[in-house]
């Protein structure tokens, strides 16, 4: 296997320091050499990490920034040598890299037109996917371009029920199984803490001294960054309505000039909203997973919908959130 050296200066923290909410944990820097895995092997590793709640970003068969961070974080959490080498047993956890998905009649009901203007969107009851490609890519945590690459020659505008598609063999984000409503507290996770690293673009959850999961995020922007400090989750909702207020989004000032946008995968906050005790700030999903970790947001902590759907089952209302 051909090797290249990709020196990754990734801040993996001291677990003990991470358990303390009063200080920003000091970084540990690990220079990591990663093998140049072929596309299928990289995909298998992405699937393994994703299924283990160490999100590598969108699955695309490439060794990108979040693939590296997820791999080192997983090794850190499981007391493994922090190198880029991968033991064969990791790959053995994903014996089948790809699977098939058959387009269903009900899938087509999840697709529709979404007007570009927020005033028009506010008149709707649901903001659906705008294409079957987006539906399938999000279901399998993948880049749209990768799904297209795996299915050459497919006419995505005219796919019919019964057609079969090749997709990564990852645990799917089954959008139809999520019902609008509040997320209850989970006493079992009352001691867990959420750390939002605005420099590495990561959300990490700790249970006492144990790293539980890591997901890539977009944490605010230069003009309206995620608020540094210690906060708490006040409440959480699945398929939330979103109060679109440009004053709040751009300047952090609530106004009466707003639109209530209905829920759906094309809602700006996606499948989940977890509100913090900081007005207008929350942890939420997105209508554009392709941009996670790269494009800016409006002060909030944004995840891909497939990661947001999982984070609600890994934390609890009332948990401490430390943004640094």
Question: What function would you assign to each model-found segment?
Answer:
Residues 17-19:
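Boundary at the C-terminal end of the N-terminal hydrophobic targeting segment
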Residues 36-69, 103-141:
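Primarily a LysM-type cell-wall glycan-binding module
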Residues 40-43, 47, 65-76, 88, ...:
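Solvent-exposed, polar/charged alpha-helical surfaces in well-ordered, non-transmembrane soluble domains
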Residues 50-58, 74-82, 94, 136, ...:
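Sec/Tat-exported extracytoplasmic proteins
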Residues 143, 154-230, 235-240:
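Cell wall/extracellular polymer interaction/catalysis modules
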């Amino acid at each position: 296997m051909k090797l290249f050296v990709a020196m990754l200066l990734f801040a993996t923290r001291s677990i003990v320091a991470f358990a303390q909410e009063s200080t920003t944990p000091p970084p540990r820097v690990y220079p990591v050499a990663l093998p140049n895995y072929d596309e299928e092997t990289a995909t298998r590793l992405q699937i393994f990490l994703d299924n283990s709640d160490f999100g590598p970003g969108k699955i695309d068969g490439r060794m990108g920034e979040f693939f590296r961070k997820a791999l080192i974080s997983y090794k850190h959490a499981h007391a493994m040598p922090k190198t880029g080498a991968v033991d064969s047993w990791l790959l053995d956890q994903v014996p089948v890299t790809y699977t098939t998905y058959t387009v269903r009649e009900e899938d087509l009901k999840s697709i529709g037109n979404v007007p570009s203007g927020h005033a028009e969107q506010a008149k709707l009851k649901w903001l659906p996917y705008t294409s079957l490609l987006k539906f399938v890519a999000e279901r399998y945590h993948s880049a749209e371009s990768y799904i297209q690459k795996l299915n050459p020659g497919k006419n995505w505008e005219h796919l019919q029920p019964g057609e079969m598609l090749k997709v990564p063999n990852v645990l799917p984000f089954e959008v139809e199984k999520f019902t609008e409503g509040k997320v209850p507290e989970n006493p079992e996770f009352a001691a867990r803490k959420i750390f939002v690293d605005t420099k590495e673009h990561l959300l990490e959850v700790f249970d006492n001294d144990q790293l539980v999961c890591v997901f890539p995020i977009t944490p605010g922007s230069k003009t309206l960054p995620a608020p540094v400090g210690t906060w708490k989750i006040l409440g959480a909702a699945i398929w939330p309505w979103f109060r679109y207020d440009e004053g709040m989004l751009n300047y952090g000032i609530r106004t009466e000039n707003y639109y209530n946008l209905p829920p759906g995968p094309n809602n700006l906050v996606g499948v989940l909203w977890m509100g913090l005790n900081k007005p207008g700030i929350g942890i939420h999903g997105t209508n554009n997973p392709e941009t996670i970790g790269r494009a800016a947001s409006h002060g909030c902590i944004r995840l891909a919908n497939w990661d947001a759907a999982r984070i609600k089952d890994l934390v609890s209302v009332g948990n401490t959130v430390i943004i640094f």
